[in-house]
Structure formats: C-alpha cells, structure tokens
Design a protein with these regions (language model features):
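Structured catalytic core of nucleotide-sugar glycosyltransferases
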Residues: 1-127, 243-246, 251-260
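Alpha-helical structural elements of signaling/regulatory helical domains
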Residues: 12, 16, 33, 169-173, ...
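Hydrophobic helical membrane-anchoring modules
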Residues: 15, 176-261
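Structural motif
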Residues: 61, 114, 171, 185-186
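Acceptor/aglycone-binding surface of glycosyltransferases and processive sugar-polymer synthases
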Residues: 66-70, 74-84, 101-175, 196-215, ...
C-alpha cells in the first residue's frame, strides 16, 4: 500500500495538467519519494486531456490515467478514482490549480488525527454566484447529511483509506462524495488554505450543473435520514423528477475506456 493517493477529476484541462503535476511533484517528492500516486480521471473531455495524461504517465511512474467512456460528472469521476486508489491516505483536488499543492502535506498530516479533512478557502477566487450556491449547499447539507455546522465541505479534501474502504463498494446510482464521507467519517476537521487564481480558461461548472448536482443529491439521498419529513420529501422528489425531464443524464456506471496502468 502507498502512503498517499491524489485523485484529480479532469475535464478539458490539457493545457493545465503538465504544470499541475509538476507542482504536486515539487511539493511531495522530498517527503514521499516514490510512495504516492496521482490518479488523473479523464471525464470524457472534449480537448486532448487524455492524450496529455498518457504522455505524462509515460514520463512519471507515479501517474495513473483513467479514461472514462462517457461523461459522468465530477463526483462520478472522483468515485472511479477512489475505486482504483491504493493509498493509505487520499486527497481529492481539482484540475485547475486553484487548489494549492503547497497544502497537500498539511492535509495529509491532519489525517493522522482525523478521518477526514476539508479545506476552508481564504479569499476565494470564485465568482459570487458560485460562492453563494456553495454556501447554501453547505447549509442544507448540515440538515440532510447530519453535517456539523462548523464544518465546511469543499472540493479539496482528504480522507483516510479505511473511510474510503467502507463506502467505495456501495456502487451508488449517482455518487455524491461528500455524503459518503460524512456518513463514514467519525471525526472531521477543516484547515485554512489559500485559494489561487485559475491557471487557464474558465470553470467547467455553471449554474445548471450545480443545480443538477443538488437535485441529484436530494433525489438519491432524500431518505438520509428523513430530515425533511414525508411531505417536504415528496414535494422535493416531484420537483426533481420534473427537472430531470428537461436535464436528463445517464445513470452513473463504471465504464472505463482505457487506463495507463
């Protein structure tokens, strides 16, 4: 077993990946040597992200590339990465360099004391609507998933390998990573990190995708643990079904097109 696995969902980021991998390696190589892996999960990108991943994997032994057969979304791509990870500790981060590689060791060290560690961003570089939606999402997830109000869930986070092992075999219809972590992690902490400017391009998440994710969360986890009550749960379920008629997508599956390992 390796000391650390880093899971990165990739979508249309071919121009960023070289710099991202180099910065991660620069921050980890002295501490971990060859005892870590970076798993890059290509979520059916429209650019040459997969070609870039294959080139990087030929250069570095610690790179593992996974090419998905079709787009499953950020949480689905992360779930595939988790299923293929071998680290005793696992850190999940984005592909846009807004998550600072300099904070990876700090997150890793927190996992000696906690089951999960979420990052709390200082001076967030996201646009206002994304910050607002994220804040609302964190508020409601406290009710839905019994999350402590003082814990802020974010996309850069770390978990212990045994936490992953407890949920990775569940194969949910549509995985919502934070709900799975919150269910299995007994003690959780936050650490503050600096939020960097996006290195290239613009965010691949828009308002529609964020709302689809939120509705997926309600549709697939509204039973958890019946905190809305039967009436609110029924209304939410009906609204979600109507929304899905207009923004339907495939159920999540584990169809991998190609691997580099």
């Amino acid at each position: 077993m390796l000391k650390l696995s880093i899971i990165i969902p990739v979508y249309n980021s071919s121009k960023i990946l070289d710099k991202l991998v180099n910065e991660i390696n620069l921050n980890l190589n002295e501490t971990f040597k060859n005892d870590y892996e970076i798993i890059l999960v290509n979520d059916f990108s429209k650019d040459d992200s997969w070609g870039t991943i294959k080139k990087i994997s030929e250069k570095f032994d610690f790179i593992k590339g996974i090419d998905l057969a079709y787009n499953v979304g950020q949480h689905g791509a992360i779930f595939v990465g988790l299923k293929n990870s071998k680290g005793d500790r696992i850190i999940i981060m984005d592909d846009d360099l807004q998550h600072p590689p300099q904070s990876l060791i700090s997150i890793y060290e927190q996992l000696d004391l906690f089951d999960a560690c979420y990052t709390l961003y200082l001076k967030r570089k996201h646009v206002f609507w994304k910050i607002f939606v994220s804040t609302v999402n964190n508020f409601f997830s406290s009710f839905i998933f019994d999350k402590p109000f003082k814990i802020y869930t974010s996309s850069m986070k770390g978990i212990r390998g045994d936490v992953k092992d407890r949920f990775v075999g569940q194969n949910p219809k549509i995985p919502f990573i934070d709900s799975l972590i919150l269910k299995e992690a007994k003690n959780i902490t936050n650490i503050k990190v600096y939020h960097q400017e996006r290195f290239e391009g613009k965010s691949n998440y828009d308002v529609k995708k964020l709302f689809i994710l939120w509705f997926d969360m309600i549709e697939n986890y509204h039973f958890y643990p019946l905190r809305f009550g039967s009436l609110i749960g029924f209304i939410s379920f009906c609204v979600v079904k109507l929304f899905r008629i207009f923004y339907a997508k495939k159920s999540f599956s584990f169809e991998i097109k190609e691997k580099t390992f």
